[in-house]
């Protein structure tokens, strides 16, 4: 007869997940024009010069330069156009609270910046 203590059930010891903090560098697409029909072809042209550069890249949409009302921004069109280019918008930065709320209603939450924004940028 074994005198070893019974082992606890493995299933009760395993955690189904763990949440951990992490920092990531993300590209910000600063919108200088609110119209997807202007932005999407321009970014598509730029990234065709470097195929695969942003393929499936998560990108944050910068709203701080827009001088229009949130109702004028076609967030669904912008999101759809970027995804067709295989660029994945994951959130927003900057802009008014109304603009951020409009973006949030289409699945783009505000992303908090941990550091001062980098001034290096790629322009069309």
Predicted features along the sequence, with ranges:
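Charge-rich, low-hydrophobicity low-complexity segments
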Residues: 2-124
């Amino acid at each position: 007869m074994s005198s070893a203590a019974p082992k606890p059930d493995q299933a009760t010891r395993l955690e189904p997940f763990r949440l951990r903090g992490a920092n990531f560098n993300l590209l910000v697409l600063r919108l200088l024009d609110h119209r997807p029909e202007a932005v999407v072809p321009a970014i598509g042209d730029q990234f065709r010069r470097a195929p695969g550069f942003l393929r499936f890249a998560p990108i944050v949409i910068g709203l701080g330069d827009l001088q229009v009302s949130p109702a004028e921004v076609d967030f669904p069109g912008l999101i759809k156009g970027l995804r067709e280019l295989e660029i994945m918008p994951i959130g927003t930065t900057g802009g008014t609270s109304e603009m951020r709320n409009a973006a949030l209603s289409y699945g783009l939450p505000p992303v908090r910046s941990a550091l001062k924004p980098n001034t290096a940028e790629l322009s069309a």
